[in-house]
Amino acid sequence: MIKQIGRFFRAFIFIMPLSLTSCESKIDRNRIWIVGTNATYPPFEYVDAQGEVVGFDIDLAKAISEKLGKQLEVREFAFDALILNLKKHRIDAILAGMSITPSRQKEIALLPYYGDEVQELMVVSKRSLETPVLPLTQYSSVAVQTGTFQEHYLLSQPGICVRSFDSTLEVIMEVRYGKSPVAVLEPSVGRVVLKDFPNLVATRLELPPECWVLGCGLGVAKDRPEEIQTIQQAITDLKSEGVIQSLTKKWQLSEVAYE
């Protein structure tokens, strides 16, 4: 079962952005698999009440590292810094609930591991929302997390006043305290948020076909073809063994329920 996301939010308020490694040092990359994440995105990854980074992606990283025969090391970055650090080989992979988009595929290899096509986003507010949702240009501002697909989509739409924040917590607080009338979230994340903040309501924002994304992908540097092949095989094996399905149930990544 998912730990209470409210505990995640409370923990996040009192814990400084977490770095799971000390200063850079020589590391045996044949023995240690370094995964970059951004622990502000429940249920994929977040900081629990004990200050530990947990979530669907973290459990998956552990399972993949076992397949690779390596020790797992998780490093924390701002979401929009993950791709750069991967391309510079400071990390071996990205597991951060990262949507597979054409623009990201131009920069890194993204290996699908969860979800099908995402054809909609979730609009969240503390006030009643019309269905279908009003054009976002009619709201004074729209809150969204920095570096995410949904931010990229909103910024591509003319006339929307976008307010970007580093974490899901900040996005929700922006709406909860009325600074922005609505926020836009990825549906599986929004589903968890709604459980912990029942005073919020949500509706669908359908995406045009050219903006659909292909689920979540594990990022690997394009110039590491052998790693891509090895990790892809590990993901395939974990799917066939039912491990990923089991983790999906554990972290309640299922159909989003809208009000």
UniProtKB/Swiss-Prot annotation:
**Gene3D superfamilies the record matches:** Periplasmic binding protein-like II
Q: Which InterPro entries match?
A: ArtJ_PBP2, Solute-binding_3/MltF_N
Signal peptide location in the record? 1-25
Q: Which UniProt keywords apply?
A: Amino-acid transport, Secreted, Signal, Transport
Please provide, in alphabetical order, the Gene Ontology terms of the cellular component aspect for this entry. Answer: cell surface; extracellular region
The UniProt entry's GO biological process terms, in alphabetical order, are: amino acid transport
User: Where does this protein hold L-arginine?
Assistant: N38, E45, A96, G97, S99, R104, F149
Note the SMART domains from the entry.
PBPb (SM00062)
Q: How is it used?
A: Was identified as a potential vaccine component. In vitro, induces antibodies capable of neutralizing the infectivity of C.pneumoniae.
**Which domain of life does this protein belong to?**
Bacteria
Instruction: List the disulfide bonds in this chain.
Output: none
Its localization reads: Secreted; Cell surface
Entries under Pfam families matching the protein? SBP_bac_3
Q: Which residues cross the membrane?
A: none
Q: Name the PROSITE patterns for this protein.
A: PROKAR_LIPOPROTEIN
Q: What is known of its domains?
A: Contains two domains, D1 and D2, which are both exposed on the surface and bind to epithelial cells.
Classification via PANTHER family: ARGININE-BINDING EXTRACELLULAR PROTEIN ARTP (PTHR35936:SF17), MEMBRANE-BOUND LYTIC MUREIN TRANSGLYCOSYLASE F (PTHR35936)
Q: Which family does the UniProt entry place this protein in?
A: Belongs to the bacterial solute-binding protein 3 family.
UniProt function note: Probably part of an ABC transporter complex involved in arginine transport. Binds arginine. Interacts with host epithelial cells, suggesting a role in host-cell adhesion during infection.
Other facts: This protein, although well conserved among chlamydial species, shows species-specific immunogenicity.
- State what protein this is by name: Probable ABC transporter arginine-binding protein ArtJ
Organism expressing this protein natively: Chlamydia pneumoniae (Chlamydophila pneumoniae)
